[in-house]
Swiss-Prot record:
HAMAP family: PlsY (MF_01043). One of its GO terms (biological process) is phospholipid biosynthetic process. Residues 25-52, 102-111, 159-205 are cytoplasmic. The chain crosses the membrane at residues 4-24, 53-73, 81-101, 112-132, 138-158. Signal peptide: none annotated. InterPro entries: G3P_acylTferase_PlsY. Catalyzes the transfer of an acyl group from acyl-ACP to glycerol-3-phosphate (G3P) to form lysophosphatidic acid (LPA). This enzyme can also utilize acyl-CoA as fatty acyl donor, but not acyl-PO(4). SMART domains: G3P_acyltransf (SM01207). Residues 1-3, 74-80, 133-137 are periplasmic. It comes from Shigella flexneri. This is Glycerol-3-phosphate acyltransferase. Probably interacts with PlsX.
């Protein structure tokens, strides 16, 4: 079945290239996430500029566009090596989307979706790591960074045959969070709920 893998890689990249953040913002009459807020077309920035409903829609779509190509390839019997490349292709599409001038998001939700078909136990542990980090720190970016750093070890424990491609995904996500890492180091990063606190202060009941 590996003969179909190159085609699945292309499909995964094209799926990843559909920027849900940009499309949802257009449909909802919101500012372009590439030029508003943090400038990142992802769920966290849509949360800042458009609220919870739009952000949830973006998050679900971004997870699915990573999950569906990998899941489809898995069901077709594609080998772990090619599954890893398909997962990476979906994330590359999200980060550098051909349909939107190669300016995309950071790939966290899409990577999470791409890893999900590998193991639901792994998915739960990864989600718990991200959520716990965000709840303790308030930083969505830190949750992504910590999850990316720990992911290869989780995968090695649950599904060791996928350790290499997941490590590549982790490196890709960490590279995309270079600016966030610098802001966290300088204590200049914005917490995920800061926008809502400011709004309540401006519009008290």
């Amino acid at each position: 079945m590996s003969a179909i893998a190159p085609g699945m890689i292309l499909i995964a990249y094209l799926c990843g290239s559909i920027s849900s953040a940009i499309l949802v913002c257009r449909l909802c009459g919101l500012p372009d996430p590439r030029t508003s807020g943090s400038g990142n077309p992802g769920a966290t920035n849509v949360l800042r500029i458009g609220g919870k409903g739009a952000a949830v829609a973006v998050l679900i779509f971004d997870v699915l566009k990573g999950m569906l190509p990998v899941w489809g390839a898995y069901e077709l019997g594609v080998s772990p090596f090619w599954l890893g490349l398909i997962a990476i292709a979906a994330c590359l599409g999200h980060i550098w989307p051909v349909f939107f001038g190669f300016k995309g998001g950071k790939g966290v939700a899409t990577a999470f979706g791409a890893i999900a078909p590998i193991s639901w136990d792994l998915t739960g542990v990864m989600a718990g790591t991200w959520l716990l980090t965000v709840l303790l720190s308030g930083y969505s970016s830190l949750g992504a960074i910590v999850s990316a750093l720990i992911a290869p070890f989780y995968v090695w424990w649950f599904k060791p045959q996928f350790t290499f491609p997941v490590s590549m995904l982790s490196c890709l996500i960490l590279l995309r969070h270079h600016d966030n890492i610098q802001r966290l180091w300088r204590r200049q990063e914005t917490k995920i709920w800061t926008k809502f606190k400011r709004k309540r202060e401006k519009d008290p009941e």
